[in-house]
Every structure is written in C-alpha cells, then in structure tokens.
C-alpha cells in the first residue's frame, strides 16, 4: 500500500505538470515550434562524431517515505494522550530529531495516505487560507494498533513484491545485450505520462525499433499493475457511500421508535393508583440489611424473617425447597416467612372483586379494558363435555395433565386422549396458550398442528424460590433439574384487534404449589386481548379469573352467569350431570 500511494502521488504531480505545459502552449503557440526545434537540434548534434552534451529532463523525483518514519507516525497517532485536533506542523516538530530529520511534505503525504486508508480523518487547508498544514480531526485507535502490529509483515511482503517485479521486468526486456538497461526501482516514473511521451519522441527520432517495442511492452505491464492498485483503492468506501449508510441508520432508528398509537396503548394498560407490588430487599433479613448499611434502621423494602423451631439446626443452612417443602414440621433446615408488621399486611389487601364494573364483551379487540365479567366455571371431565355449548372464544389456555412418566398428585391423560380433544370448535380466529414440559414439548407442537394452529411464539417461565433466587433443586427433570417451563403460543385464522408488542416472552415468577402457573400470564393475555371471552382448560380453583370460563375436574360445582350459555347448557344437560357418552 505504501508503494501504491507513492506512485499515485507522483502520477498526480506529473499530470499537473503536463496540464500546466498544455496551458502554456495554448497561450503561446510559438513555444510548440521552439520545443520541436530543440528536439531536432538535439538529434542533429547526436549524429556528429564529437561528444554531445545532452541535458536530461528535469523531472522531480519524489522519494517514498521512510518505513521507519511511517511506523513512528503510526505510533504517535495511536497514543491515547494525543490531543485532537492537531496539525501536520506540530506533528513534524514532534517527530523531527537531529538523528532522523523529518520534512513537512513527507508528514503531509503520510497523513493523506492514512486518511485514504480510513485510519484517520483530516481536513485540508482552504485555497484562501494562508496556512498550508493539514489538520488531523480524529483517529481510529483500533485500526492504528492493527497497522502497527502488521508493519513487520507488510515490510517483508513489500520486499518480496519488489524482487518479483524486477524479475518480471527482466523477462519482459529480454536477454539481448544491446537492449540491456540499468535496473530501476519497480513501478516508478516509467508509468508516468511524461516518461511515456519522452520515450515516444526518442523512438520517433531514430532510436531503434526493437528497443521501442520492448519498452512499450514493459510500460504496458507496469501500467496494468498500477491499474490494479488504483482499482483496489477505488473499491474503498467513498464519502457518499458513508453518508448514505449514515442516513440508513437514522431511518432505522426512526422505524424502531414507538408510534403515538403504540404509546397510547401502553399508557392505557399502565397501573393506576398506588403500586400493587413491593420490592424485596437484596439482603434478605432486616439484620443483614442493617449490617450492610450506614443507617441504624433497615430500608423500607420487604424483608424475610427466619423460622427457628426446636428441631431446626442453623448450621445446616437454608432448606432447598423453602416454603414448598413437604416436611416443614420436621425439616431441620432453616425456613423463612415475610417480615412485615400487622398493619402493613392489612393495607396490602387489594380492591375487592365486587367493585369492578361487570359486563360481557364478546367482540374481539374491545377497548373497554376496565369492564370485566365475573368468573365462571364448570366442574367436569373435559373429555366428555360438549364444549360447543360454550360458544366461541378469543383466547384459549390449557395446562394439560401430560403423561410425563412421573408420580403426580393428579391423574394424567394419554397422548391419544390429548389429540382427540375437541379444541378446534372453541375458536374460529384467536390464540391458544398451551403449557408444556419435559417430553410433552414435541407432543404439544404436534397437537397445535393437529388442532389447526400455527406456532408463533413461546413463553418461558423462569422459576424463582421464596427468596427470589433462581431454583437449583427442582423436583422435575431426569438428567438436569428443570428451572423453567414453556408455554407454546399458537394462532388460528386471521385474528383482528389484538395488541402487539406490549409484553415480552419471559416471565420471572415464584414457584408455588404443584402445577400452579404464574398469575402474570393472565395479565399478559388480558393486555393482548382486552375485554374478550376467554376459556381455560384443566383449571383448578386458583385459576378462576374474571372474563374467563374455567373447566376442570377439581372445581366446586357449576357456576355460569352468561344467559346464552346457561340456556344452551340446560338444554344439553337438563339434569346438570355431565356423564360419559355411550359411544365413547
């Protein structure tokens, strides 16, 4: 890259010189005859037997920058303590020493080279400015350090390339003694337009036809090398391309900004009034909170209190299962409970369910978020219930008792029984939330496809213990303890009026009783489809929610309030008993 930059600079200066000569010829036509006459007289004098004094053309040869100087300049620019912006005169004074003098033109040439390589950004002096120094405005330390590391390798590559070029020139010129010429540095002034014009004039004045042909071939070979290097330089990203990329990034930022409608939907579901949750203290107990702080009083966050019984051995540490332990009456490990005053417990009670405005909204996408219909449920065996009497729903959620080959405190369904459930009749357009675990993940995906749903998302429930830490000793899992559960989200038809992008697909919540899913899923579904009819399958008493109809064999009787559903239920089951059909 160093040789390429030097040749391009030399080529640029020679082009400028040729342009000046052409302009002078246009202004003074007699100068052309003078130059031609001087060429003819020179050729006539060369034919005389006496010694002729031939003045060589005064072509300014620019020596390439010293590699050591380039390395020193890279090291100077890569210093983190360098104050920017700085000019080329200041850099020249810093690098100039008595042992190795440095010229201002070399420093400017190297700075322009580094700018072309996108190592630094420079600003050239204006035409009207009296200063001729180049201003360095910013540097890329990462690229500079990479260039310093690869300096040794690049020098070895340059030496090898120079030797290859010399060998190639010798092959192009041939081995005839009459045409031998002293070796010159590769890819220098021989590729310039001035040298090419001089060689053409010499050939036309009677200098040997064979030598001119071979010199022309050599010029073509070297010109091809220069063309390749110029092409590699032109392939770098231009200022216009960089500006276009910057505009694209700004457009992407604008597209990622939420619109006024999205902000309005988020504001609609924002919690009103005081906060309904309290934050736990990171230190656990009040004693540890006081010891870690500078104040004699604990913080206002929620703390835990140790439960120390007669059989408790504090040296054993905390129980792995904490408040989910099955043997708390005899467990020797330490357990915890919430440490809060009695008045705080009374204030923590939320508003009564009866205070909510009641109303049934069966239209998908109803914006009346605050209107809720009372909870309804039916105690039954879902395999035998004719679910067509319940109508259509916008959202269906199911937590099936999968047969996962474990000892569970409830009955399970076989894989075939799960596949035969009449889920498709519950929806024409909407969403299905299906909880799966263990080997049931693949079976759940199969059931989604069988029931006519396309899986579009998957919610992860990360389980935490009573102390709000990730559990490490779960009771599920064969090879690894399971610390999470999955909820597959399927879509059917073309649902309209649902809110997109309000929640993420991760729930972090505390573990409670067996198969007790987090209550956060209900808020997530309500924000997705506010005010619509929803149904939950395989529910238990703690799953009963407003706007939901819950089906399960552990519920308390039958509680229906929707007049249309009540009429269809009485017509289908006059005696109120849901029994197994005779054809099953």
UniProtKB/Swiss-Prot annotation:
Any coiled-coil regions, as ranges: none
Positions with a binding annotation for S-adenosyl-L-methionine: 381-382, 399, 517, 540-543, 553-554
Protein name: N(6)-adenosine-methyltransferase subunit METTL3
Chain's role: The METTL3-METTL14 heterodimer forms a N6-methyltransferase complex that methylates adenosine residues at the N(6) position of some RNAs and regulates various processes such as the circadian clock, differentiation of embryonic and hematopoietic stem cells, cortical neurogenesis, response to DNA damage, differentiation of T-cells and primary miRNA processing. In the heterodimer formed with mettl14, mettl3 constitutes the catalytic core.
Region Interphase loop, residue ranges: 466-483
Tissue specificity: Expressed in the hemato-vascular system: enriched in sorted endothelial cells and haemogenic endothelium.
Cellular component GO terms, alphabetical: cytoplasm; nuclear speck; nucleus; RNA N6-methyladenosine methyltransferase complex
Residues covered by region (Disordered): 1-65, 162-221
Any one GO molecular function term: RNA methyltransferase activity
Catalytic reaction(s) noted: an adenosine in mRNA + S-adenosyl-L-methionine = an N(6)-methyladenosine in mRNA + S-adenosyl-L-homocysteine + H(+)
Residue ranges of the region described as Gate loop 2: 511-519
Region (Gate loop 1): 400-414
Enzyme class name: transferase
Pfam families documented for this protein: MT-A70
Stated family: Belongs to the MT-A70-like family.
Effect of disrupting the coding gene: Lethality 10 days post-fertilization (dpf) due to severe hematopoietic defects. Levels of N6-methyladenosine (m6A)-containing mRNAs are significantly decreased and emergence of hematopoietic stem cells is blocked.
Subunit structure: Heterodimer; heterodimerizes with mettl14 to form an antiparallel heterodimer that constitutes an active methyltransferase. Component of the WMM complex, a N6-methyltransferase complex composed of a catalytic subcomplex, named MAC, and of an associated subcomplex, named MACOM. The MAC subcomplex is composed of mettl3 and mettl14.
Motif (Nuclear localization signal): 213-220
Subcellular location: Nucleus; Nucleus speckle; Cytoplasm
Residues flagged as site, Interaction with METTL14: 442, 445
């Amino acid at each position: 890259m160093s040789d390429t930059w030097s040749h391009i600079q030399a080529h640029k200066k020679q082009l400028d010189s040729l342009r000046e000569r052409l302009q002078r010829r246009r202004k003074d036509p007699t100068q052309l005859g003078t130059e031609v006459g001087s060429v003819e007289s020179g050729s006539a004098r060369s034919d005389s037997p006496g010694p002729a004094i031939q003045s060589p053309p005064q072509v300014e040869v620019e020596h390439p920058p010293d590699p050591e100087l380039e390395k020193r300049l890279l090291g100077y620019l890569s210093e983190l303590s360098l104050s920017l912006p700085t000019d080329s005169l200041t850099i020249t004074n810093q690098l100039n020493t008595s042992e190795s003098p440095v010229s201002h033109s070399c420093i400017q040439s190297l700075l322009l080279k580094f700018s072309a390589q996108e190592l630094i950004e420079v600003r050239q002096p204006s035409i009207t400015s009296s200063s001729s120094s180049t201003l360095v405005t910013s540097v890329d330390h990462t690229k500079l350090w990479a260039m310093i590391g690869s300096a040794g390798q690049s020098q070895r590559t340059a030496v090898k390339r120079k030797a290859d070029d010399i060998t190639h020139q010798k092959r192009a010129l041939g081995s005839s003694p009459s045409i031998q010429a002293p070796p010159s540095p590769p890819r220098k002034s021989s590729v310039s337009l001035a040298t090419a014009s001089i060689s053409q004039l010499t050939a036309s004045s009677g200098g040997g036809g064979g030598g001119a042909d071979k010199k022309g071939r050599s010029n073509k070979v070297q010109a091809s090398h220069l063309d390749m290097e110029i092409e590699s330089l032109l392939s770098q990203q231009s200022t216009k391309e960089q500006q276009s990329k910057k505009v694209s990034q700004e457009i992407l930022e604008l597209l990622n900004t939420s619109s006024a409608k999205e902000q309005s939907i988020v504001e609609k579901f924002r919690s009103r009034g005081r906060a309904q949750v309290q934050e736990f203290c990171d230190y656990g107990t009040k004693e540890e909170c006081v010891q870690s702080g500078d104040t004699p009083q604990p913080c206002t966050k929620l703390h835990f209190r140790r439960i120390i019984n007669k059989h408790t051995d504090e040296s054993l540490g905390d129980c792995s299962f904490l408040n989910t332990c099955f043997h708390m009456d005899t467990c020797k490990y330490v357990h915890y409970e919430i440490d809060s005053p009695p008045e705080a417990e009374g204030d923590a009670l939320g508003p009564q369910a009866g205070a909510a405005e009641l109303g049934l909204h069966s239209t998908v996408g109803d914006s009346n978020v605050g209107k809720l219909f009372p909870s309804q449920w039916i105690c039954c065996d879902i395999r035998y219930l004719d679910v067509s009497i319940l109508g259509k729903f916008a959202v269906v959620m199911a937590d099936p008792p999968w047969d996962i080959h474990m000892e569970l405190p409830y009955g399970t369904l076989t894989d075939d029984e799960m596949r035969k459930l009449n889920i498709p009749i519950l929806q024409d357009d909407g969403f299905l939330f299906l909880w799966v675990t263990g080997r049931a993940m693949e079976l759940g995906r199969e059931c989604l496809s069988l029931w006519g749903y396309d899986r579009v998302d998957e919610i992860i429930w990360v389980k935490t213990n009573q102390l709000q830490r990730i559990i490490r000793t779960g009771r599920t899992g064969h090879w690894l303890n399971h610390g999470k559960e999955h909820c597959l989200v399927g879509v059917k038809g073309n649902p309209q009026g649902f809110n997109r992008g309000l929640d993420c697909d991760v729930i972090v919540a505390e573990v409670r009783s067996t198969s007790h899913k987090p209550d956060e899923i209900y808020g997530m579904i309500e924000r997705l489809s506010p005010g619509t009819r929803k149904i939950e399958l395989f529910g238990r008493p703690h799953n009963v929610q407003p706007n939901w109809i819950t089906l399960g064999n552990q519920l308390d009787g039958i509680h229906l309030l929707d007049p249309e559903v009540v009429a269809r239920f009485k017509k289908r089951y006059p005696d109120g008993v849901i029994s197994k059909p005779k054809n099953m």
